[in-house]
């Protein structure tokens, strides 16, 4: 799979959740996380995809750069955090695809999710469980998928 363009919506270490409003062609502050909670990585949307929740597929981007909403980053897929989400009585898949910025010097050595420590991956799962509670969405069956499985899943979402 060639490089994947991810558009940053919410920069890392921010407590504000930003979303792109297609009708207005602007980024809007959607939600503020509780005191002490922040996004551990840049979060964004993958171009030319449509996930089960009706939005472009979600991505987490590892980069040492400071970013802001609207920045386009060429990335390499390293896997995904699969999640089932219950919202309004309906269960859907709402995976977060994990990416490394292609030009990253700090994270360039990371090729797969297993390159992270077990503690890192457990904390990432906990972040999403807590984030789901803030959003009033129940996330279940959180598990990591390898690069190949993530590629197959992402291809299915391509528009």
Where are these regions (language model features)?
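Hydrophobic N-terminal alpha-helices or hydrophobic patches in metabolic proteins across all domains
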Residues: 1-159
């Amino acid at each position: 799979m060639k490089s994947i363009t991810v558009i940053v919506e919410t920069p890392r270490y921010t407590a504000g959740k930003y979303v792109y409003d297609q009708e207005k062609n602007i980024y809007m502050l959607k939600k503020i996380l509780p005191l002490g909670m922040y996004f551990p990585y840049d979060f964004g949307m993958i171009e030319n995809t449509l996930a089960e929740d009706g939005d472009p597929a979600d991505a987490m981007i590892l980069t040492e750069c400071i970013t802001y909403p609207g920045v386009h980053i060429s990335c390499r897929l390293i896997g995904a955090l699969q999640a089932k989400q219950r919202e309004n009585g309906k269960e859907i898949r709402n995976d977060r695809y994990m990416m490394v910025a292609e030009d990253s010097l700090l994270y360039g050595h990371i090729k797969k999710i297993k390159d992270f420590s077990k503690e890192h991956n457990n904390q990432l799962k906990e972040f999403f469980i807590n984030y789901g509670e803030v959003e009033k969405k129940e996330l279940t069956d959180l598990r990591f998928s390898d690069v190949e499985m993530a590629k197959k899943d992402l291809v299915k979402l391509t528009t």
